[in-house]
Amino acid sequence: GKPVVGVVLIPVKNEIYYAVEGGGAFYESLNGENLKISASHKSEYNEMVMVKSRSHASEKLMKLIDKYKFKDVKDSGSSIKICLIARGLADIYFRFGNTNEWDICAAHCVLSEAGGKMTDCLGNTLIYNKVDPLNRNGFIASNNAIHSKFVEMAQETI
């Protein structure tokens, strides 16, 4: 299956991201900010912000960071990275290695509704609600401007 509703709550920041298939993606904060969000359209690496995991940095990822000169590389937690791309505050997130589908499903819906894209690292559509809930080929979340190029970049590291 595919995600059709997504809600990502970030209690420590008093923020929430949510989306329903066909209805757009939204961000709200406790201070009253309420925005319809969309991914950026940046396509030049030196203008893009990469987000990465504090706890899952890999040799593959470090090779990409060294080779491609992104504007900035920021650490962030879990599904928050995907939501930052959906909001246009970041542009690319590579996750090499296994992930559980429940860790990314809601954020995937938010990103898709914001105009971004997520695939596995081979460029295949992510499938949810499988017998085996593990995504064994990692994933790439992007602003979608040059997603196919990011898939090629991921292949360089394999």
Cite the ranges covered by each PLM segment:
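Acidic beta-strand-loop-alpha-helix segment within the catalytic core
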Residues: G1-C83, R136-I158
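Oxyanion/phosphate-interacting regions
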Residues: K63-K67, C83-I158
